[in-house]
């Protein structure tokens, strides 16, 4: 005889706390956890980062008698089969559930890796990009090697980003973008990023940051297109407004989108975005941020430093794009903008007064410069060298060459002084260098400046007897510089390709051009060219600038 046992039920406020029968999802049933039946995902599924599935066919009739369970083996097999059909490959060991809000800078991105397109409603495809992005009518002969997003459903633009996703995206940006584009003051950003009263410009910057961050992640490609569309929409909105002085966040968003367009779209689109960015910088008059007359001394140093960094990043983009396309510079007024401070001073809000670019080039400053500031100095020297090349092309056949060789010698002396300073700073360094991508890029661009100067004097055929020594010295120095770049390429191969400076392919292509035009210099030329070519292929997986140099 079976014994009937009356089950007791706990009540709170007159209502039963027992979970409604049949309401638990498959994940909670499988883990034997209490399910709160929230939509679209219960709390347990949200924390585990898995899809919350409820099966209408899965129901268990609970017997009123504890000692009366019919067919236990059959029921267990049925339950296992149903769970296996829904999630045949789920492995709990793949997910890290130990997320701590206090250790923000040590978090991982496992939660975002489990976001699927099915988590969002279906969107109708956009017919075209925002109006400021030009339509591409010219066929591109370069294959797109980046991960394609066609056919992947994007989240709706008004879909809220929860706190966990928000923090993961911010951390991804700091890990993979901020060190290469150090224009953002982190404390200032975190002071407003969660504010419900943030401005449209701040929202635009936020989405621009996430656009670039997701583009450098293999797991988040399905999010980047919607972020990109939202950013472009906000940028178009600001462009249509008649505002006298745009906010600094708007300029920062423009800078990030230029980098995105160059790396993930194509050179023409990046060039067009750069034009908009430069106009914003000029409209804000950032080229005179440190002009003594009329400067607002009450403005805090961090805000001025952010504006300086926005100017110098736009200047760097303008310079590298002009080198790539052999065009004149658009931003030329650098006399009233101090060079960016060291990153540690900037991040810690430590006031310092940096020298001007002209002071550094004249050798009248002994200030310690950041790797980014050093790269600005060497990039400016390269630009002066290319301007001298244009001057040589315009010389008449009968003109004197004395003045030209004096300019070449002057630039060579400036380079020797800057390179000697770098050699002293890195005298204890060995290959491979540290994983600081900006420092590695700075050393590469410093060496490439010697290659640019060598090409300039080589194109000038009217060498006098007094200039033979300069020519021979430059040839030897160019060989050494090319070898240094080849050595650095070995170091870069050991870095994450997501952390390589976007314009590294420009330097590698210049080195490869030097080797190919001087194949009789040494016996290791072919090996060096092959190594650089392999590095370009390595970078081309995430950077379309490298794709253009591979053809």
From Swiss-Prot:
InterPro entries: TF_fung (IPR050815), Transcription_factor_dom_fun (IPR007219), Zn2-C6_fun-type_DNA-bd_sf (IPR036864), Zn2Cys6_DnaBD (IPR001138). Residues 1-21 are annotated as: Disordered. GO terms for biological process: DNA-templated transcription. Residues 7-20 have a biased composition (Polar residues). GO terms for molecular function: DNA binding; DNA-binding transcription factor activity, RNA polymerase II-specific; zinc ion binding. It is found in: Nucleus. Residues 25-52 bind DNA. GO terms for cellular component: nucleus. Keywords: DNA-binding, Metal-binding, Nucleus, Transcription, Transcription regulation, Zinc. It comes from the Eukaryota. Transcription factor that regulates the expression of the gene cluster that mediates the biosynthesis tropolone class of fungal maleic anhydrides, including stipitaldehydic, stipitatonic and stipitatic acids. PANTHER family: C6 FINGER DOMAIN TRANSCRIPTION FACTOR DBAA-RELATED (PTHR47338:SF3), ZN(II)2CYS6 TRANSCRIPTION FACTOR (EUROFUNG)-RELATED (PTHR47338). This is Tropolone cluster transcription factor tropK. The gene is tropK.
